[in-house]
Amino acid sequence: MNLVMLILALWAPVAGSMPELSLTLFDEPPPLVETEPLPPLSDVSEYRVEYSEARCVLRSGGRLEALWTLRGNLSVPTPTPRVYYQTLEGYADRVPTPVEDVSESLVAKRYWLRDYRVPQRTKLVLFYFSPCHQCQTYYVECEPRCLVPWVPLWSSLEDIERLLFEDRRLMAYYALTIKSAQYTLMMVAVIQVFWGLYVKGWLHRHFPWMFSDQW
């Protein structure tokens, strides 16, 4: 294209029938604009986490309850931590419920999460936190375990399924036996009440000879 424009520019004065063309082979680069330097980052080397611990359990109905403890040189205020849960299939999601700060000192921070329903196949609970707003993010993980009492009268079938998922088969079979005995006694009690209120009175009215003294 540049070669064609060059031929036309040289031929135009001779022919006298074409206007003059301005020939620009290269555009000049724009001038450099000086920008203000970025402010220096603050020194955050003094903030660090020296110890972290996580405890989490699953109560009846798949309700997650977790407690995290952090120790170290932490900023005031501390950034809000984030909590995620991961299932066996690899699916992860953030817990929208904010954790509760139950700290008693500035050196040790304690965060508590309670009564949040998670899937029964939850494998890990991840807790992300930072000692300051510009510090590196740390995380600690814990594997929730189903909390079932020794007399699991109020445990559900979902809790037994969770015990099998955790490979705690002995506890799962024990809970299933207790629940079966509980349901059996409840059915016997219902049958006795139904017999005393309805069946026995109906028999008295229609078959009085069944309750005579001759029998």
Swiss-Prot record:
Disulfide bonds: C56-C142
Pfam families: CMV_US
This protein's GO CC annotations: host cell endoplasmic reticulum membrane; membrane
Range of residues in the leader sequence: 1-17
Keywords recorded for this protein, A-Z: Disulfide bond, Early protein, Glycoprotein, Host endoplasmic reticulum, Host membrane, Host-virus interaction, Immunoglobulin domain, Inhibition of host adaptive immune response by virus, Inhibition of host MHC class I molecule presentation by virus, Late protein, Membrane, Signal, Transmembrane, Transmembrane helix, Viral immunoevasion
Result, substituting Q192V: Loss of the capacity to induce the degradation of MHC class I molecules
Domain Ig-like H-type: 47-146
Cell membrane in keyword set: no
Major localization class: host cell
Ranges in the topological domain labelled Cytoplasmic: 204-215
Lumenal side of membrane: 18-182
Glycan attachment points: N73
Localization per Swiss-Prot or TrEMBL: Host endoplasmic reticulum membrane
Membrane topology type: Single-pass type I membrane protein
One of the protein's GO biological processes: symbiont-mediated suppression of host antigen processing and presentation
Record's subunit section: Interacts with host TRAM1.
Protein name (Swiss-Prot/TrEMBL): Unique short US11 glycoprotein
